[in-house]
A protein has these predicted regions:
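Active-site glycine-centered loops adjacent to acidic/histidine catalytic or metal-binding residues
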Residues: 45, 71-72, 98-99, 168, ...
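Short linear proline/tyrosine/threonine-rich motifs used for host-factor recruitment
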Residues: 322-324, 329-334, 339-343
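A short C-terminal boundary segment appended to hydrolase-like catalytic domains
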Residues: 34, 249-323
Length: 352
Protein backbone atom coordinates (compact mmCIF):
# COMPACT_ATOMS: atom_id res chain seq x y z
CA UNK A 1 0.00 0.00 0.00
CA UNK A 2 1.42 3.36 -1.00
CA UNK A 3 1.91 5.86 1.80
CA UNK A 4 1.18 9.53 1.21
CA UNK A 5 2.83 12.11 3.41
CA UNK A 6 1.45 15.60 3.97
CA UNK A 7 3.46 18.58 5.11
CA UNK A 8 1.54 20.93 7.37
CA UNK A 9 2.64 24.55 7.56
CA UNK A 10 1.50 26.73 10.41
CA UNK A 11 1.61 30.44 9.70
CA UNK A 12 1.26 32.85 12.56
CA UNK A 13 -0.50 36.06 11.58
CA UNK A 14 -1.55 39.04 13.65
CA UNK A 15 -5.03 38.56 15.09
CA UNK A 16 -6.45 41.41 13.04
CA UNK A 17 -5.29 39.83 9.75
CA UNK A 18 -6.68 36.40 10.66
CA UNK A 19 -10.00 37.90 11.69
CA UNK A 20 -10.33 39.97 8.53
CA UNK A 21 -9.51 36.96 6.34
CA UNK A 22 -12.29 35.07 8.10
CA UNK A 23 -14.61 37.98 7.37
CA UNK A 24 -13.78 38.06 3.65
CA UNK A 25 -17.16 38.07 1.85
CA UNK A 26 -15.67 36.97 -1.46
CA UNK A 27 -14.94 33.60 0.17
CA UNK A 28 -18.29 33.35 1.90
CA UNK A 29 -21.63 31.90 0.90
CA UNK A 30 -23.13 35.36 0.41
CA UNK A 31 -21.14 36.12 -2.73
CA UNK A 32 -22.75 33.26 -4.65
CA UNK A 33 -26.30 33.85 -3.50
CA UNK A 34 -28.77 34.62 -6.28
CA UNK A 35 -31.91 35.59 -4.38
CA UNK A 36 -33.58 38.77 -5.59
CA UNK A 37 -35.09 39.74 -2.24
CA UNK A 38 -32.44 40.79 0.25
CA UNK A 39 -31.27 43.77 2.25
CA UNK A 40 -27.92 45.48 2.64
CA UNK A 41 -26.57 48.18 4.93
CA UNK A 42 -24.06 50.95 4.12
CA UNK A 43 -22.08 53.44 6.19
CA UNK A 44 -18.61 54.97 6.23
CA UNK A 45 -16.16 56.54 8.68
CA UNK A 46 -16.77 54.09 11.50
CA UNK A 47 -13.76 54.44 13.88
CA UNK A 48 -13.55 52.63 17.25
CA UNK A 49 -15.59 54.28 19.99
CA UNK A 50 -18.98 54.15 21.69
CA UNK A 51 -20.65 55.71 18.63
CA UNK A 52 -19.07 53.01 16.45
CA UNK A 53 -20.50 50.24 18.62
CA UNK A 54 -23.95 51.83 18.46
CA UNK A 55 -23.61 51.90 14.68
CA UNK A 56 -22.68 48.21 14.62
CA UNK A 57 -25.71 47.41 16.80
CA UNK A 58 -27.84 49.42 14.38
CA UNK A 59 -26.44 47.35 11.49
CA UNK A 60 -27.01 44.03 13.27
CA UNK A 61 -30.58 45.06 14.06
CA UNK A 62 -31.31 45.08 10.31
CA UNK A 63 -29.91 41.55 9.77
CA UNK A 64 -28.28 42.48 6.44
CA UNK A 65 -26.89 39.98 3.96
CA UNK A 66 -24.29 42.54 2.87
CA UNK A 67 -22.49 45.30 4.76
CA UNK A 68 -21.00 47.98 2.50
CA UNK A 69 -18.18 49.68 4.41
CA UNK A 70 -17.57 52.96 2.60
CA UNK A 71 -14.00 53.67 3.71
CA UNK A 72 -12.17 55.24 6.65
CA UNK A 73 -13.31 52.43 8.91
CA UNK A 74 -10.02 51.96 10.76
CA UNK A 75 -8.48 55.41 11.38
CA UNK A 76 -5.85 55.04 14.15
CA UNK A 77 -7.70 52.34 16.05
CA UNK A 78 -5.92 49.87 18.26
CA UNK A 79 -6.22 46.50 16.43
CA UNK A 80 -7.94 44.85 19.40
CA UNK A 81 -10.44 47.70 19.68
CA UNK A 82 -11.03 47.56 15.93
CA UNK A 83 -11.83 43.87 16.07
CA UNK A 84 -14.31 44.40 18.90
CA UNK A 85 -16.24 46.55 16.46
CA UNK A 86 -15.79 44.60 13.22
CA UNK A 87 -15.80 40.98 14.37
CA UNK A 88 -19.57 41.13 14.77
CA UNK A 89 -19.92 41.71 11.01
CA UNK A 90 -18.34 38.39 10.08
CA UNK A 91 -18.82 37.21 6.50
CA UNK A 92 -20.85 40.09 5.04
CA UNK A 93 -18.23 42.83 4.59
CA UNK A 94 -17.50 44.58 1.28
CA UNK A 95 -14.93 47.37 1.54
CA UNK A 96 -14.52 50.62 -0.38
CA UNK A 97 -11.19 52.40 0.05
CA UNK A 98 -11.12 55.74 1.91
CA UNK A 99 -8.58 58.53 2.20
CA UNK A 100 -7.42 57.27 5.62
CA UNK A 101 -6.89 53.79 4.17
CA UNK A 102 -3.36 53.49 2.79
CA UNK A 103 -3.25 50.92 -0.02
CA UNK A 104 -0.54 48.88 1.71
CA UNK A 105 -2.64 48.54 4.87
CA UNK A 106 -5.89 48.21 2.92
CA UNK A 107 -4.60 45.44 0.63
CA UNK A 108 -3.22 43.57 3.63
CA UNK A 109 -6.49 43.62 5.55
CA UNK A 110 -9.09 43.11 2.84
CA UNK A 111 -8.85 40.66 -0.03
CA UNK A 112 -10.42 42.14 -3.16
CA UNK A 113 -11.41 40.06 -6.20
CA UNK A 114 -9.03 41.70 -8.70
CA UNK A 115 -6.32 42.88 -6.28
CA UNK A 116 -7.16 46.47 -7.15
CA UNK A 117 -8.86 49.11 -4.98
CA UNK A 118 -11.87 49.13 -7.33
CA UNK A 119 -14.09 46.20 -8.26
CA UNK A 120 -17.67 45.14 -8.97
CA UNK A 121 -19.91 42.23 -8.07
CA UNK A 122 -23.51 41.07 -8.45
CA UNK A 123 -25.85 40.01 -5.70
CA UNK A 124 -29.14 38.67 -7.00
CA UNK A 125 -30.39 41.26 -9.49
CA UNK A 126 -28.27 44.11 -8.11
CA UNK A 127 -24.96 45.19 -9.62
CA UNK A 128 -22.53 46.90 -7.23
CA UNK A 129 -19.57 48.95 -8.46
CA UNK A 130 -17.02 50.05 -5.84
CA UNK A 131 -14.88 53.00 -6.97
CA UNK A 132 -11.60 54.09 -5.40
CA UNK A 133 -11.72 57.87 -5.05
CA UNK A 134 -8.11 57.66 -3.81
CA UNK A 135 -6.83 56.32 -7.15
CA UNK A 136 -6.48 57.94 -10.57
CA UNK A 137 -9.94 58.92 -11.84
CA UNK A 138 -8.88 60.97 -14.85
CA UNK A 139 -10.55 60.15 -18.17
CA UNK A 140 -8.66 57.37 -19.95
CA UNK A 141 -7.08 56.19 -16.68
CA UNK A 142 -7.17 52.46 -15.99
CA UNK A 143 -9.89 52.95 -13.40
CA UNK A 144 -11.96 55.17 -15.70
CA UNK A 145 -11.83 52.50 -18.41
CA UNK A 146 -12.87 49.86 -15.87
CA UNK A 147 -15.80 51.97 -14.63
CA UNK A 148 -16.97 52.86 -18.14
CA UNK A 149 -16.81 49.26 -19.37
CA UNK A 150 -18.36 47.84 -16.21
CA UNK A 151 -21.36 50.20 -16.27
CA UNK A 152 -21.84 49.66 -20.00
CA UNK A 153 -22.04 45.88 -19.53
CA UNK A 154 -24.27 46.12 -16.45
CA UNK A 155 -26.69 48.51 -18.16
CA UNK A 156 -27.24 45.96 -20.96
CA UNK A 157 -27.59 42.94 -18.68
CA UNK A 158 -31.29 42.00 -18.56
CA UNK A 159 -30.82 40.06 -15.33
CA UNK A 160 -29.72 43.24 -13.52
CA UNK A 161 -32.55 45.38 -12.14
CA UNK A 162 -30.51 47.86 -10.13
CA UNK A 163 -27.08 49.48 -10.50
CA UNK A 164 -25.48 50.91 -7.36
CA UNK A 165 -22.17 52.79 -7.24
CA UNK A 166 -20.11 52.91 -4.04
CA UNK A 167 -17.50 55.59 -3.31
CA UNK A 168 -15.79 57.14 -0.32
CA UNK A 169 -15.45 60.81 -1.29
CA UNK A 170 -18.75 62.35 -2.44
CA UNK A 171 -19.38 63.32 -6.04
CA UNK A 172 -22.26 65.58 -4.97
CA UNK A 173 -22.83 67.02 -1.49
CA UNK A 174 -23.93 70.04 0.52
CA UNK A 175 -21.19 72.40 1.68
CA UNK A 176 -19.43 71.10 4.78
CA UNK A 177 -15.93 69.99 5.70
CA UNK A 178 -14.09 67.97 3.03
CA UNK A 179 -16.35 69.19 0.24
CA UNK A 180 -13.62 70.60 -2.04
CA UNK A 181 -12.82 67.54 -4.10
CA UNK A 182 -10.94 66.49 -7.20
CA UNK A 183 -11.67 68.15 -10.53
CA UNK A 184 -11.88 64.70 -12.11
CA UNK A 185 -15.03 63.97 -10.10
CA UNK A 186 -17.01 66.12 -12.53
CA UNK A 187 -16.52 63.45 -15.20
CA UNK A 188 -18.61 60.87 -13.40
CA UNK A 189 -22.18 62.11 -12.70
CA UNK A 190 -22.88 62.41 -16.46
CA UNK A 191 -21.44 58.90 -16.86
CA UNK A 192 -23.70 57.56 -14.10
CA UNK A 193 -26.75 59.17 -15.74
CA UNK A 194 -25.83 57.78 -19.16
CA UNK A 195 -25.67 54.19 -17.93
CA UNK A 196 -28.78 54.33 -15.76
CA UNK A 197 -27.17 54.13 -12.33
CA UNK A 198 -29.92 54.12 -9.72
CA UNK A 199 -28.06 55.14 -6.56
CA UNK A 200 -24.59 56.45 -5.69
CA UNK A 201 -23.74 55.76 -2.03
CA UNK A 202 -20.85 57.78 -0.62
CA UNK A 203 -19.29 58.82 2.73
CA UNK A 204 -16.25 60.92 3.82
CA UNK A 205 -18.52 63.74 4.97
CA UNK A 206 -19.58 62.77 8.50
CA UNK A 207 -23.33 63.26 8.28
CA UNK A 208 -26.34 62.12 6.25
CA UNK A 209 -27.52 63.62 2.97
CA UNK A 210 -29.87 62.54 0.17
CA UNK A 211 -30.33 64.41 -3.06
CA UNK A 212 -33.41 64.65 -5.21
CA UNK A 213 -33.21 62.36 -8.25
CA UNK A 214 -30.93 64.39 -10.51
CA UNK A 215 -29.35 64.20 -13.94
CA UNK A 216 -26.18 65.94 -14.99
CA UNK A 217 -25.12 66.31 -18.58
CA UNK A 218 -23.29 69.41 -17.35
CA UNK A 219 -21.83 69.08 -13.85
CA UNK A 220 -22.42 72.72 -12.95
CA UNK A 221 -26.12 72.52 -13.83
CA UNK A 222 -27.77 69.52 -12.15
CA UNK A 223 -31.36 68.89 -13.19
CA UNK A 224 -33.81 67.99 -10.40
CA UNK A 225 -36.11 65.55 -12.17
CA UNK A 226 -38.74 65.21 -9.44
CA UNK A 227 -39.24 66.02 -5.75
CA UNK A 228 -41.30 62.90 -5.04
CA UNK A 229 -40.07 60.28 -2.56
CA UNK A 230 -41.28 57.47 -4.80
CA UNK A 231 -40.01 57.41 -8.38
CA UNK A 232 -39.79 55.12 -11.35
CA UNK A 233 -36.47 53.56 -12.25
CA UNK A 234 -34.54 55.65 -14.76
CA UNK A 235 -36.05 58.92 -13.56
CA UNK A 236 -32.74 60.19 -12.19
CA UNK A 237 -29.71 59.29 -10.10
CA UNK A 238 -29.96 59.43 -6.31
CA UNK A 239 -26.84 60.48 -4.36
CA UNK A 240 -26.72 59.44 -0.70
CA UNK A 241 -24.01 60.40 1.78
CA UNK A 242 -23.85 58.17 4.85
CA UNK A 243 -20.68 59.10 6.71
CA UNK A 244 -22.01 59.05 10.26
CA UNK A 245 -20.46 55.75 11.29
CA UNK A 246 -18.81 56.96 14.47
CA UNK A 247 -16.08 59.54 13.82
CA UNK A 248 -16.68 63.21 14.71
CA UNK A 249 -19.80 64.59 13.00
CA UNK A 250 -19.67 67.53 10.56
CA UNK A 251 -22.17 70.34 10.78
CA UNK A 252 -23.54 71.90 7.59
CA UNK A 253 -22.50 75.29 6.26
CA UNK A 254 -25.43 75.37 3.85
CA UNK A 255 -27.92 73.17 2.02
CA UNK A 256 -27.41 72.60 -1.68
CA UNK A 257 -30.53 73.18 -3.80
CA UNK A 258 -30.38 69.62 -5.12
CA UNK A 259 -30.17 68.04 -1.63
CA UNK A 260 -33.60 67.06 -0.30
CA UNK A 261 -32.72 65.83 3.19
CA UNK A 262 -29.69 66.35 5.43
CA UNK A 263 -28.89 65.99 9.12
CA UNK A 264 -25.78 65.58 11.30
CA UNK A 265 -26.43 62.39 13.28
CA UNK A 266 -24.79 58.99 13.60
CA UNK A 267 -26.55 56.24 11.68
CA UNK A 268 -26.76 53.96 8.66
CA UNK A 269 -28.84 53.31 5.57
CA UNK A 270 -30.66 50.02 5.10
CA UNK A 271 -31.72 49.11 1.55
CA UNK A 272 -34.35 46.47 0.79
CA UNK A 273 -34.00 45.12 -2.73
CA UNK A 274 -36.70 43.18 -4.56
CA UNK A 275 -37.28 42.43 -8.22
CA UNK A 276 -39.62 45.41 -8.55
CA UNK A 277 -38.53 47.94 -5.93
CA UNK A 278 -35.54 49.39 -4.13
CA UNK A 279 -36.46 50.89 -0.75
CA UNK A 280 -33.88 53.04 1.03
CA UNK A 281 -34.27 53.78 4.73
CA UNK A 282 -31.99 55.92 6.89
CA UNK A 283 -31.84 54.97 10.58
CA UNK A 284 -30.12 57.05 13.24
CA UNK A 285 -28.40 55.40 16.19
CA UNK A 286 -30.97 57.07 18.43
CA UNK A 287 -33.83 55.10 16.88
CA UNK A 288 -33.23 51.66 15.33
CA UNK A 289 -36.93 51.09 14.66
CA UNK A 290 -38.24 54.14 12.78
CA UNK A 291 -36.45 55.41 9.67
CA UNK A 292 -35.73 59.13 9.66
CA UNK A 293 -35.71 59.22 5.85
CA UNK A 294 -37.26 56.87 3.27
CA UNK A 295 -37.09 56.72 -0.51
CA UNK A 296 -38.41 54.14 -3.00
CA UNK A 297 -37.47 53.43 -6.61
CA UNK A 298 -39.93 51.33 -8.61
CA UNK A 299 -38.91 49.05 -11.46
CA UNK A 300 -40.60 50.04 -14.71
CA UNK A 301 -43.79 52.04 -15.03
CA UNK A 302 -46.10 51.81 -12.03
CA UNK A 303 -49.67 51.80 -13.39
CA UNK A 304 -51.09 52.65 -9.97
CA UNK A 305 -49.35 56.04 -10.11
CA UNK A 306 -50.32 57.66 -13.44
CA UNK A 307 -48.38 60.85 -12.72
CA UNK A 308 -46.20 61.51 -15.79
CA UNK A 309 -42.51 60.92 -15.19
CA UNK A 310 -39.51 62.04 -17.17
CA UNK A 311 -36.70 59.87 -18.43
CA UNK A 312 -33.54 60.71 -20.32
CA UNK A 313 -32.37 58.53 -23.16
CA UNK A 314 -29.03 58.99 -24.90
CA UNK A 315 -29.07 58.15 -28.61
CA UNK A 316 -25.85 57.79 -30.58
CA UNK A 317 -26.47 58.49 -34.24
CA UNK A 318 -24.49 57.05 -37.11
CA UNK A 319 -22.33 59.26 -39.30
CA UNK A 320 -24.06 61.36 -41.87
CA UNK A 321 -27.41 63.11 -41.92
CA UNK A 322 -30.95 61.84 -41.40
CA UNK A 323 -33.64 61.37 -38.79
CA UNK A 324 -34.15 59.08 -35.81
CA UNK A 325 -37.68 57.66 -35.52
CA UNK A 326 -38.77 57.23 -31.91
CA UNK A 327 -40.76 54.19 -30.70
CA UNK A 328 -44.36 54.23 -31.94
CA UNK A 329 -43.32 56.87 -34.47
CA UNK A 330 -44.38 59.75 -32.23
CA UNK A 331 -41.61 62.11 -33.33
CA UNK A 332 -38.51 62.16 -35.47
CA UNK A 333 -35.26 63.76 -34.35
CA UNK A 334 -33.11 65.26 -37.12
CA UNK A 335 -29.34 64.97 -36.93
CA UNK A 336 -26.46 66.02 -39.12
CA UNK A 337 -22.69 66.36 -39.29
CA UNK A 338 -21.67 63.03 -37.83
CA UNK A 339 -22.16 61.40 -34.48
CA UNK A 340 -24.04 63.31 -31.80
CA UNK A 341 -25.55 62.43 -28.44
CA UNK A 342 -29.09 63.67 -27.91
CA UNK A 343 -30.89 63.70 -24.54
CA UNK A 344 -34.51 62.76 -25.22
CA UNK A 345 -37.09 63.55 -22.54
CA UNK A 346 -40.46 61.86 -22.83
CA UNK A 347 -43.62 61.37 -20.82
CA UNK A 348 -44.22 57.96 -19.22
CA UNK A 349 -47.98 58.36 -19.68
CA UNK A 350 -47.48 58.15 -23.45
CA UNK A 351 -46.81 54.86 -25.26
CA UNK A 352 -43.10 54.33 -25.83
Amino acid sequence: MMKIYYKIAIIVLPAIIVSMICMNPFLSRYAAAEEKNFNFVAVGDLDCNINSMQTVNNILDKKPQIFLALGDMYYDCNPDEFMKVFSLLHGILYMTMGNHDSWSKFAGLYHLPNDKPYYSFDKGNVHFLSISTESDLRPNSTQYDFINTDLDIASQNRSISWIIVLAHRPFISSETEHITEKEDFKTYPPLFARYGVDVVIQAHVHNYQRTFPILLDNFSNPIIVTKNNTINEGTGVLYITTGGGGHDLYEFKSKSPYVQTQYAEYGIINVNSTENALTIEAYTNKDFESPKDTFTILKGYNTTKPTPMLKYVYINTSKGNGTIPTPKGLIEIPFENGTVRIPVKYNYSLPH
